[in-house]
């Protein structure tokens, strides 16, 4: 972005989803601002919002979840460093972006820190597209179900009792 803009080019950075939710939008803008390069941000629909809607899984629901956490399962150093006890709150949905490769480790830690092994989980591959695949399970068995279904990235993980609503709210197929 900076290199081309400094050459006088008009540059468009097209990002699927919302550039400010695990999209490096903030980091890129910091660089542009340091060089006094003008820019504009057009926010998109975050993957969590789009994928959950196309999967028939509301992220919040008065009977199930009054809060929702967005987390990344992809780390600079490759080390998962969540504050695990904070992820275990009742009536909360946890959404994990880019977490397919670390699903087994995250599952073990969630159970270790007190989340029920029967907590509903959805893993959605290629959400909002005609290739969308949704695998539903519980913490205790989601890894084996995902492996059996041969899910690949991009995938979003949704954890919480809201996942149970999919059986009645699924409209996309």
Residue map of PLM features:
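Short glycine-cluster motifs
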Residues: 3-74
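A contiguous loop/helix-start segment that scaffolds small-molecule binding in enzyme catalytic cores
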Residues: 6-12, 24, 30, 67, ...
